[in-house]
Design a protein with these regions (language model features):
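N-terminal secretory signal peptides that target proteins for export/translocation
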Residues: 1-10
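Beta-propeller-forming repeat regions
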Residues: 4, 28-246
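Bacterial N-terminal signal peptides
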Residues: 13-26
Length: 246
């Protein structure tokens, strides 16, 4: 449950739209590995305020390292997009042993999407929800069904539709794989997302609430389909216990 805050720091960007090399030179000897990411460029140009304030972000700074160098890249969004998010997530989506950067990227006319970046720019994105002021809340990423490919899960419109959607990385894109209704992980105005991914006994599972916030729910893939069950009455302590496999 990450607190919402303005992340400040690097200001030595080359400027301009898209991806900019900010600091250092990449080494030709060893591959760069992403070690950190943060949002910059706070903006009030999108008034959704789903996370409790009217401040979103226009820039994503990605930090990488190789054997000799530390490099920073800056992604600057076009004027009709914002990062409607808390913090960037370092999740391995491509299953190469190194993380990518996963963010909520919102088109101000078409709503939220889940976008994946690396140091080359955006490498994948789920479809935008379809209209303004519509958002999604990430849950986690893992090989949920044991097929050797990574799936990434989020709740589509956690205040309205309350549908858990699972997209699979197919080697070039994120493709819708499974979905299940009746689950949520965010309430309007909260500056955190409830639940997440846990691995208990070697099995990745998704922790959320049910649609009316009465129960903590655990969802796993069984026989190629999502299966959900209650872990008991909802409370913040119960969510923490569930994530810790207690």
């Amino acid at each position: 449950m990450a607190p919402r805050r303005l992340l400040r720091g690097l200001r030595r960007s080359m400027g301009g739209a898209g991806l900019a090399l900010c600091v250092g030179l990449a080494s030709p000897v060893a591959a760069e590995v992403i070690t950190g990411a943060r949002f910059e460029g706070p903006t009030t140009r999108y008034g959704h305020a789903i996370l409790g304030d009217g401040i979103e972000f226009t820039e994503l700074v990605i930090e990488t390292e190789d054997w000799a160098n530390k490099v920073r890249y800056r992604v600057t969004l076009p004027a009709d997009h914002v990062f409607e998010d808390l913090e960037p997530r370092l999740w391995d989506i491509t299953d190469d042993g190194a993380p990518e950067v996963v963010v909520i990227e919102t088109d101000m006319a078409r709503g939220g999407s889940l976008a994946v970046y690396d140091q080359t720019g955006k490498i994948a994105e789920t479809p935008h929800i379809g209209r303004t002021n519509r958002w999604l809340a990430p849950v986690g990423a893992a090989d949920l069904d044991g097929d050797g490919r990574i799936e990434v899960a989020f709740v589509d419109r956690p205040h309205l539709a309350k549908v858990l959607r699972v997209f699979e990385w197919d080697g070039t894109a994120l493709v819708l794989d499974m979905e299940l209704g009746g689950l949520t992980n965010h309430r309007i105005g909260e500056d955190f997302i409830t639940g997440g991914l846990r691995v208990c006994g070697g099995m990745p599972e998704l922790i959320t609430a049910d649609a009316d916030w009465s129960d903590v729910m655990v969802t796993r893939v069984v026989g190629g389909a999502l299966q959900t069950a209650s872990l008991g009455p909802f409370s913040p302590a119960a969510v923490e216990a569930a994530l810790a496999c207690r």
